[in-house]
Amino acid sequence: MLEEINYDTKLFGLIGKNIKYTLSPYIHNFSFRTLGINAVYLVFDLDEMKFKRSISGILEIAEGLNVTIPYKDEVMKYLDNTDTHSTRIQAVNTIYKKSGYNTDYLAIKNLVRKKIKNVSGYECYIYGAGGAAKAAAFALSELGCSSISIVNRTKSRAYELAELLNKNGYNASIKENCNITNNILIVNSTPNSSVVPEDCVKKSDLVIEFVYRPVETELIKNAKKYGIQYINGLEILVNQAVEAEKIWFNKSVADEKIIEYLYARELVW
């Protein structure tokens, strides 16, 4: 955070509900200091009523925002425009001057490319059907996954996501759980990493975890146990934040430097 706030200080922040746990202020205020940017990043923890009453005002005064659960879908109707990716995904997690973007989508594409050069022919199982699941599903489909299988407790949400993907020309369906075959990618976008069976993990080629506290979730522990490649939630959180800063400032701090700072501050474990 800035030592001094003045007339020229720009306002950035995170909008969500029940987000006391978030690391976003630490990440972005560290980046602002490192980059020498006169800005401050705050948290707007809003219930549904407060969101409806305040969102228009926040959008007027903030230079840029991040959006998390449960408002990634709803915030779109308050924006002037959205980019191609967030329009197709129907979820926004980054805003710059009333324009919407999806950096979860960008982060998944960036990080998966580092692990597997070609995912063509892979079957992807996504646990969850919210905004993060949508971003992951579109990112993996565009990278070449042959099919997306949605596993979600609320079947209506799963059907909505599958229908959205199919309308965009991808191959999506609903499953009760994973079928153990070759060439599997697994994504957990739910708060509970134990939803993914261990048998599925040990047969997969890559595991993607959105939960970042603790960094080593049960899913990540199982991936390590069987020598499976993985992307942890902290990597996703930091990379999507870096992509947001590229949108806001056309520059950013390196992922590794941010992660090093978070561990040094003992904010992650």
Swiss-Prot record:
Pathway: Metabolic intermediate biosynthesis; chorismate biosynthesis; chorismate from D-erythrose 4-phosphate and phosphoenolpyruvate: step 4/7
Gene name for this UniProt entry: aroE
Source domain of life: Archaea
E.C. number: 1.1.1.25
Quaternary structure (record): Homodimer.
Disulfide bond found in the keyword field: no
Function: Involved in the biosynthesis of the chorismate, which leads to the biosynthesis of aromatic amino acids. Catalyzes the reversible NADPH linked reduction of 3-dehydroshikimate (DHSA) to yield shikimate (SA).
Family, as annotated: Belongs to the shikimate dehydrogenase family.
Name of the protein in its database record: Shikimate dehydrogenase (NADP(+))
Phylogenetic lineage: Archaea, Thermoproteota, Thermoprotei, Sulfolobales, Sulfolobaceae
